[in-house]
C-alpha cells in the first residue's frame, strides 16, 4: 500500500515540476520582425514588476546581431533597457530567415533564451517565450480586440502555459 502511495506522490510531483519543451516557430523573417512591438500580456517577471505600456523595439545591427530596446512605464516614469540578441545554438540565418526562431538576448546580465513560438502570417502578432516561466504576447498595435486576444491566449494555453497568471497590459 505504501508503495502505491509513494508512486502516486512521485507521479504528481513529476507532473507539477516537469518542464515543457519550448518549441519555436520553424523560421522567422528577421526584417519583417524588426521594429516596434507592444506588449499585450505577459507572465509575471521580477524585472517587469509594476510595468505598464511596455514596448520592445528590434533593430538589425549586423546579419547576426539585433539591438533590443525594451521600454515600460513605472509610476509615470519611462524605464528603458537596451541589449543585444544573437542566434541561439543550432540556429542559422539563411536568406534573411532565422531557422528556427530562437535567439539569445543579453541585457548585461548574461544571455537568456528568446523563442518566437508564434507569429501570424502578417507579422502583426507574436508570442515569445523566454523559457518555461516567461512569456509575452506582442502586437504591432497598442490595443487589440477581445477576439484576437482570446485567440492568442488559446495558443499560449495550448503551449502548456498557465494562462490564469497572464497580466494584460
Swiss-Prot record:
Outline what the protein does.
Could play a role in the transport of a small ligand.
Q: List GO BP terms, alphabetically.
A: response to stress
Example GO CC term: the record gives:
extracellular region
What keywords does the record list, in alphabetical order? Secreted, Signal, Transport, Virion
Protein name, UniProt field: Putative lipocalin R877
Q: Where in the cell is it found?
A: Secreted; Virion
Disulfide cysteine pairs (residue numbers): none
Lineage in the entry? Viruses, Varidnaviria, Bamfordvirae, Nucleocytoviricota, Megaviricetes
Q: What domain of life?
A: Viruses
